[in-house]
């Protein structure tokens, strides 16, 4: 199955994106980054084998914990509120971009 890695601040965002991705044949692996904590840390192997990485955080990419894991991977950024309110559009946009 095609994997998308999602880095987010809460499980609501991850679950909504995961549901939509599953409908389209993609699997979402996610970790929660809140403050200085990482919950459900994703391995470097999973990150490197993913089709894409999606950051849905209310902070800049430079402030992500252990950012070195994400060097040289295809990534996307979206506001958490957009991901929660329109998860289908977010996932469809990523898949469309990957297929181009």
PLM feature spans:
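Anaerobic metallocofactor- and corrinoid-dependent redox/one-carbon enzyme cores
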Residues: 8-11, 34-38, 74-80, 86
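Short, structured active-site "lid" loops
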Residues: 44-68
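Short acidic, S/G/P-rich loop/turn micro-motifs used as interaction or catalytic elements
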Residues: 12, 59-62, 82-83
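N-terminal beta-loop-helix "entrance" segment that forms/cooperates
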Residues: 25-51
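Short, structured coil segments at secondary-structure junctions
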Residues: 24, 70-73
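Ser/Thr/Gly-rich flexible loops in soluble cytosolic domains mediating phosphotransfer, phosphorylation
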Residues: 3, 72-100
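Short glycine-rich or small-residue beta-strand-to-loop segments that form or flank ligand, phosphate
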Residues: 3-9, 53-56, 76-77
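Short, charged N-terminal beta->alpha structural module
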Residues: 2-33
């Amino acid at each position: 199955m095609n994997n998308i890695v999602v880095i987010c601040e809460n499980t609501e965002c991850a679950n909504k994106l995961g549901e939509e991705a599953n409908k389209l044949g993609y699997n979402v692996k996610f970790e929660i980054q809140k403050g200085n904590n990482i919950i459900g840390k994703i391995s470097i192997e999973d990150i490197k084998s993913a089709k894409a990485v999606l950051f849905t955080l209310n902070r800049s990419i430079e402030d992500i914990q252990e950012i070195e894991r994400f060097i040289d991977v295809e990534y996307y950024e979206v506001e958490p509120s957009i991901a929660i309110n329109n998860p289908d559009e977010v996932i469809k946009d990523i898949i469309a971009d990957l297929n181009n």
